[in-house]
Amino acid sequence: MIFNSQFFIFSFLQNLDRQLLLAINRAYSPALDAVMVFASNRIVWFPVYALLIGWLIYYFRRRALLLLPLVIGAVALADTITSRLFKPYFGRLRPCHDTGVNALLHLPDGCGGQFGFLSSHASNSFALAVFLLIALPAGRLRSLKIVVLCWAALLSYSRVYLGAHYPSDVLGGAIVGGLLGWGAATIFNYHSQPAVPYS
């Protein structure tokens, strides 16, 4: 009885995951295709990351010597855990490689690697976003915090839109990345006073 209940719940969640994927993926247009392909391309964000690192060094000054290793470490660890641990261990095919669903998908950006659980894009972006939300001083830089959080959400959404991940891949990746970002920011705040802008 317990086994049957667990199987029913698993089947329900799996079906829900697939239906959400199809609903998001099928709500496409040429304009959205361009936006999502752009958002999902890691290379185009490198200049933004460079500017962000430069700004963090300017804003935190000496404390950046602690902040940068922590935030870079959180993102790198998020990427390693999702890419080298979860994906090969669980071996869950990306939707675009899954013969049970890929014929129904709109794939404007082709298909990436074979496995998709968990999403590295989601884990990396939320590790960075959550770190900044916590490490930046409370009550300040609200616009930046909102932009960073929206960026992480858009990047994660784009992975489902493009058929590269199931929603659960993205949700799980966001949780892992968020926890790592929270942990790194907590360490930073413990060893550093809240940032005060230099005049």
Question: Predicted regions span which residues?
Answer:
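N-terminal transmembrane-helix/juxtamembrane module of multi-pass inner/ER membrane proteins
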Residues: 1-49, 82-113
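Alpha-helical membrane-inserting segments
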Residues: 52, 77, 81-86, 180-188
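Interfacial segments of alpha-helical transmembrane regions
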Residues: 53-82, 145
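Hydrophobic alpha-helical transmembrane segments
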Residues: 40-60, 121-132
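Membrane-embedded catalytic cores of phosphoryl/pyrophosphoryl-handling enzymes
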Residues: 106-199
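Membrane-interface elements of multi-pass transporters and channels
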Residues: 27, 31, 59, 63, ...
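Alpha-helical transmembrane segments of multi-pass integral membrane proteins
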Residues: 37-41, 70-71, 173
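Short, aromatic-rich membrane-interface segments at the entry and exit
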Residues: 42-46, 64-69, 142-145, 167-168
